[in-house]
Each structure stands twice: as structure tokens, then as C-alpha cells.
Amino acid sequence: MKKLLFAIPLVVPFYSHSAETVESCLAKPHTENSFTNVWKDDKTLDRYANYEGCLWNATGVVVCTGDETQCYGTWVPIGLAIPENEGGGSEGGGSEGGGSEGGGTKPPEYGDTPIPGYTYINPLDGTYPPGTEQNPANPNPSLEESQPLNTFMFQNNRFRNRQGALTVYTGTVTQGTDPVKTYYQYTPVSSKAMYDAYWNGKFRDCAFHSGFNEDPFVCEYQGQSSDLPQPPVNAGGGSGGGSGGGSEGGGSEGGGSEGGGSEGGGSGGGSGSGDFDYEKMANANKGAMTENADENALQSDAKGKLDSVATDYGAAIDGFIGDVSGLANGNGATGDFAGSNSQMAQVGDGDNSPLMNNFRQYLPSLPQSVECRPFVFSAGKPYEFSIDCDKINLFRGVFAFLLYVATFMYVFSTFANILRNKES
């Protein structure tokens, strides 16, 4: 009896902390909060958590961490808390946990109707206003040599963010004749990029966009960056398992690293294997590094700079020629020669004295013709005599003719000797 009385204080607090009833739980207000130890129902995909003796269901925009055990959302009380071993299988353990095969459910992004518990934004629903980066009414498609890596599937369409716009895969295009090359065409559907939190090309629980005029539907990962890394290319499927493993063991779409159930306590470890496509990755890097390059703009910019340099050099040369011409013609020292004014002022007329004047003194004096005047000998003497101009002009004409003949003969004989020497 004493032992029983001693045990009563230990048993009463154990039951008193969970004195909630269904009515008291349902009367609790909704709360927007982040709960831990969250599990997901394998069939409805709803998320549940025990808190303060009540069972809560996550509604609205549900955002979870990478291991999906902590989620943020609008939590609604639906009844009394349930033991952890009776959960939906995500907590591992109980006999009613997730199956032992760990095959995983079909990724919801391939369906046309969103599955409850997931948040979607349809890239084709027309909620994207026109912008300046791209004009969806007059799209400018981009052609890729190979299917790019950074794409994601949604409602049977493949999308890609590129150059500040959301683009959608619209088929293949062939160009050329020898050889014929096939390109993958992506056409803009929005003037804004769509930022998505996904792994292995799949949406997880949150897709959001930003920068719109309307009130955007934005959600972020709590405790984890929304920019998740890309998995290896062509990763193989994981081999999930474990007796208490969650429903998302290996993943039917090649989850690779999520084997064994990321939400459960199962002991099975997933494994993924695949060949890394180096060529595809190289093409993706090439496209990422060159997608913003505008060849025409670069050529135009280079041509403009070269034309400017050529114009400056041409103007400098023209100015120098003008300065030299002015200095030679006595127009003053200007431009490049303006600094020599003080020195030139000490010579002649300074910079107003043509340079040619300084060279004329070194030129030989050539005879100049004058008006004919009679030659008078011994003027005023008894034996004075004179030669009239008509006789002088006659002599000049005869002498000039003889000089012409002699010059012609000299030139003719010179060329004749050259020709004779060439023939011999």
C-alpha cells in the first residue's frame, strides 16, 4: 500500500500534462508557426505534428526544410495528439509505418492537377505581366546545341530561366544543309524569371517567383537555402528500404541520394550511380558564360573607339600640316610652333618672316632679260660708233638658234650612245 501511494505522485503528472480533450483542441486558434517532428501521411500527403497535447494539420503554403521534419505553415488543430508510433510512417518504427520497399510516389510535377500538400504556380497561367527583358507577345527564342541542365518539368512542359525571363521548350529546330544541325528551342513565356526550389529537377514543396506588379505568391525555405544544388547528371535511382522507412525511399525518378526514406527512421541506405555527362556540362557552362554576350554590340563598340582614335590622329596631322604651312608662308607661328615665338622674334621679322626668305640668299643669281638698248662705244669721242637694236636682236636670234641646235645635237648623241652601249 505504501508503495502504491508512493507511485501516485509520479503517475498523476504523467496524465495531467495531457488533459486536453477533442473539444479543447478544436477550440484552439489557428497558428502560423514552424513545428518540428513533422510527419507526412503517405496517402494524402498531408503533414501532421503533435503540439501541446493536440494533433495539428499543416494547411496553406507549407514550407519544409530539406529533411522535411520541420515545416512552416498555417497549423490547424484537428484532434488529440497521437503516439508517435502510430504516425503515417514518416517517423519510422511502428507497424503501420511506410512500406519496406521504399519505391516512392510519382513526382507530382508531372500531373495536371496539383496534389494536396504541395504548392504550385503554373508558369502558363497568364499571371506574368509584360516587362522589358523579354516581350512574350513577340518572343525571341534561344537555340541550344544540347538539352540544357538547369530545366524543370511542370504540367508536362519543360521550363528554363534564361536572361531574366522564363522560357519553355517548344521543340527542335534544324539549320544548315551540310551538315544539318539540330537545336533545342526555348521560347520566352514571361518577362520575369521564375525562381524555384527543387531537387533533381522536381518541385518539392515550394515554388515562388518575385518582381511582379501584383502581390506575388512568395515562400522561402526555413533553415535552408532555397538555391538547392543540382544532383549529378543521369543519376540512378536509389534503393530505399528499411522496415520503418518513409514513402520516399529511392524515388522512382532517380532520386539517387534520398534512398532509405529521408523522413523515416529506417535503416536502409539508398545508393545512386550514373555516368557524369561531361560534354553536356561543358555545353551548359559555355551557354552560361556566353548567353549575355552581344557580338554586334561588341563590334559596334570597338568600331566606335577605333573611329574616334583615327579621327583624333587625323585632326592632329591636319593641324600640324597647317602649322608648318603657316610658318613657311609667314602667317605666324601657331599650334605646335607657338612656343618658339620668343626665339623667332630675335631673327628678322620674327614669326611673320617667311622661312623661304632665309634660303633665297643661297640660291644662284640667274640673268634676267631687259629692254634692248643700243651699244655705244666711245661716246663723245671723234671715233664714237654704236650698234643698233635691230642688229643686236638679229645676233641674239642667230645665236639662240645655234644654241638650240647644239643642245639638240648633244642630247641626241647622248641618247644614241646609251642605245649603242645597250645593244653592244
Curated annotation (Swiss-Prot):
Membrane topology: Single-pass type I membrane protein
Annotated region (N1), positions in chain: 19-85
Renumbered residue ranges of the record's region G1 (Gly-rich linker): 86-104
Keyword match RNA-binding: no
Location(s) in or outside the cell: Virion; Host membrane
Region of interest: CT: 275-424
Protein's recorded name: Attachment protein G3P
The organism of origin for this protein: Enterobacteria phage M13
Gene this chain is encoded by: III
